């Protein structure tokens, strides 16, 4: 596989048929019963969401998003979500390129920082791509839906 064959672009409605199964590789949530039209409309309504797909030979092999948060103090911050690369494409720098694309979006939107949450086994991957842990910083989550 040649690196230049991966094309990154903004996610489109038609991509959901491939993005949802890809997300299944990331989490145990069952996306098969979700109404893709409703999901797409909710995604579009949130104009702070910026999702992109990576295409290889016309097939979606990667997905990621960066949510832009406008701060009251006049700055913007980005939060990376749902980074996933198809199992068949892992180890081929697709994830590295996906992160670079999302960082560029953050720069274009004027973000002063980007944060992300990841599982411990992925920590070194993100550190190699410029992210750092912050001492004494702990992520807390409150799930409102199962």
Residue spans for each PLM region:
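Conserved N-terminal entry element of GNAT/NAT acetyltransferase domains
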Residues: 1-14, 146
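Conserved acetyl-CoA-binding loop-helix of GNAT-fold acetyltransferases
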Residues: 85, 91-104
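Residue-level recognition of the GNAT/N-acetyltransferase active site
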Residues: 12, 86, 90, 119
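A conserved beta-turn-beta hairpin within the catalytic core of GNAT-like acetyltransferases
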Residues: 69-80, 90, 136
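Conserved catalytic-core motifs of GNAT/GCN5-like acyltransferases
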Residues: 115-117, 121-123, 127, 132-146
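Acetyl-CoA-dependent GNAT
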Residues: 10-14, 18-21, 25-75
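Conserved beta-strand segments that form the floor/walls of ligand-binding pockets within enzyme
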Residues: 53, 65, 79, 84, ...
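Conserved GNAT acetyl-CoA-binding A-motif
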Residues: 106-118
């Amino acid at each position: 596989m040649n690196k230049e064959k991966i094309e990154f672009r903004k996610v489109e409605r038609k991509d959901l048929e491939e993005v949802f199964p890809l997300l299944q590789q990331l989490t145990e949530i069952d996306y098969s019963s979700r109404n893709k039209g409703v999901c797409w409309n909710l995604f579009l309504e949130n104009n702070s969401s910026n999702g992109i797909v990576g295409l290889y030979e016309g097939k979606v092999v990667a997905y990621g998003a960066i949510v832009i948060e406008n701060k009251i103090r006049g700055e913007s911050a980005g939060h990376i979500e749902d980074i996933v690369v198809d199992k068949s494409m892992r180890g081929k720098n697709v994830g590295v390129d996906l992160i670079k694309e999302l960082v560029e979006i953050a720069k274009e939107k004027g973000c002063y920082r980007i944060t992300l949450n990841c599982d411990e086994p992925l920590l070194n991957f993100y550190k190699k791509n410029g992210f750092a842990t912050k001492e004494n910083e702990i992520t807390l989550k409150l799930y409102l839906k199962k």
